[in-house]
Amino acid sequence: MEQRYATSPEQVPGMDTAELRRRYLVEDLFAEGEVHAVYTHHDRVVLAGIVPTGDALDLPTFPEIASTTFFEHREAGIVNVGGPGTITVDGETHDLAHGSCLYVGRGADGVSFRSADPAGEAGPARFYLFSAPAHTAHPTTLVEAGGGTVRELGDQLTANRRTLNQYVHENGVKSCQVVMGVTTLHPGSTWNTMPAHTHDRRTEVYLYFGLPAGDRVVHLLGQPAETRHLLVADGQAVVSPSWSIHSGVGTAAYSFVWAMAGENQAFDDMDGVPVAELR
């Protein structure tokens, strides 16, 4: 598990490209046959990528979280961004197709991951886990791809028409603080979350997927009057502290998992920034 300490907005103007990427971009989250994890001290979020290619992969109990089991004091939302697979929690096995989401609550044990057909055309499952501390237990719940609360956003004329699926949220699958969903851009649209906004009470992470290998998303971050950018590839994640905008434009259409943790779960608790005020 890699640890990343929290940063302040005053640090960003002095960062070069390499430091921006080291602080906020998670490049090597998915590796076949392995579990890769990052612990960010922004709201104590843990990100993990799990890619089973043979036997089932167990979720480790990382020493950095100082718990008997991973879920002793935590909850998580998990989205499969690869081929079909299964997650076993407390002896019960859940089938996850591409884009499906499983919420796992505090106190869960015996969590393992398996690909249905790692050598098949769809390839191995790629499970993306987003975890935050939890004070109480909620039941493990599966949401099929395309389910949850659906919002149609944007317009083809502004190249930001997209479908947003809310999976784990205050009016959907219950959790302590994790909020999670998937947004998919329509063909011909390339912008996400523009006009941009910040969440002064929550950390948010974007995981980009479904992006062709030769394409990139130009992801904007930083305070609205002091923005920077990252070039992001398929399967990479960007950590957005509470003070940072999070928006991007791709060289092709794509999807992304958005997930938040912090003070509250209100989806619309955001501070909008007019485009003309960005710098």
From Swiss-Prot:
InterPro entries: KduI, KduI/IolB_isomerase, KduI_N, RmlC-like_jellyroll, RmlC_Cupin_sf. Binds 1 zinc ion per subunit. It is an enzyme of class 5 (isomerase). Its cofactor is Zn(2+). Pathway: Glycan metabolism; pectin degradation; 2-dehydro-3-deoxy-D-gluconate from pectin: step 4/5. GO terms for biological process: D-galacturonate catabolic process; D-glucuronate catabolic process; pectin catabolic process. SUPFAM superfamilies: RmlC-like cupins. It comes from the Bacteria. Zn(2+) binds at H197, H199, E204, H246. The keyword Zinc applies. The keyword Zinc applies. Keywords: Isomerase, Metal-binding, Zinc. Its EC number is 5.3.1.17. Catalyzes the isomerization of 5-dehydro-4-deoxy-D-glucuronate to 3-deoxy-D-glycero-2,5-hexodiulosonate. HAMAP family: KduI (MF_00687). Belongs to the KduI family. This is 4-deoxy-L-threo-5-hexosulose-uronate ketol-isomerase. It comes from Kineococcus radiotolerans (strain ATCC BAA-149 / DSM 14245 / SRS30216).
